[in-house]
Amino acid sequence: MPKGILGRKVGMTQIFTEDGRAIPVTVIEAGPCVVVQKKTIANDGYNAIQLGFGEIKESKVNKPLKGHFNRANVKPMRYLREIRVENIDAYEVGQEIKVDIFTVGEKVDVTGISKGKGFAGGIKRHGFHRGPMAHGSKYHRRPGSLGAKGPARVFLGRKLPGRLGMERVTIQNLEVVKVDPERNLLVIKGSVPGIRGSLLIIKEAVKGK
């Protein structure tokens, strides 16, 4: 059964294995989350649960959202995200989902918003090659040709300099190294998208089964 949880990125560190190898890991504050809504094939065309995560002042929640939380009989949450599930009957509105749904060694997919880098050139943004850097060359880090003379215009979708980052990114098949249910911490091997404190969606791996 697909499973998932919302979390907040704490930061990166490293842990050592028994044979002395250092493993870079990311610490995530995962959950506890609350099921705010259930979506079924009969009513919505697909099975999913809506999870709430994070504290927020009630004064910062607008009236439509207050009504949404009141119908579920749960306190207001900062984040609401949907996660597709197969067995919708296994969940109930108001049910709490904790980090212990994952086990050590399990593979997960982590989704987040990548760090914003601001305006970047073609080399940094798309991996273009440089031109000659010696004296006499007038072409160093410029994009180069943008198309043929015939159309006399630049086609939509051409790779150009522009804003880099701040995009939804999913990293697949990351290994769960440690689970700490008491402190709601999930330790995952490798890096995950986003800055410290940003929202993450951790789901069971699609390709790592």
UniProtKB/Swiss-Prot annotation:
Cellular component GO terms, alphabetical: cytosolic large ribosomal subunit
One Gene Ontology term of the molecular function aspect: structural constituent of ribosome
Keyword ATP-binding: no
Keywords of the record: Ribonucleoprotein, Ribosomal protein, RNA-binding, rRNA-binding
Pfam families linked: Ribosomal_L3
Biological-process GO terms, alphabetical: translation
InterPro entries: Ribosomal_uL3, Ribosomal_uL3_bac/org-type, Ribosomal_uL3_CS, Transl_B-barrel_sf
Subunit record text: Part of the 50S ribosomal subunit. Forms a cluster with proteins L14 and L19.
Family to which the UniProt record says this protein belongs: Belongs to the universal ribosomal protein uL3 family.
Function: One of the primary rRNA binding proteins, it binds directly near the 3'-end of the 23S rRNA, where it nucleates assembly of the 50S subunit.
Listed name of the protein: Large ribosomal subunit protein uL3
Record organism: Carboxydothermus hydrogenoformans (strain ATCC BAA-161 / DSM 6008 / Z-2901)
Species classification: Bacteria, Bacillati, Bacillota, Clostridia, Thermoanaerobacterales
Name of the gene: rplC
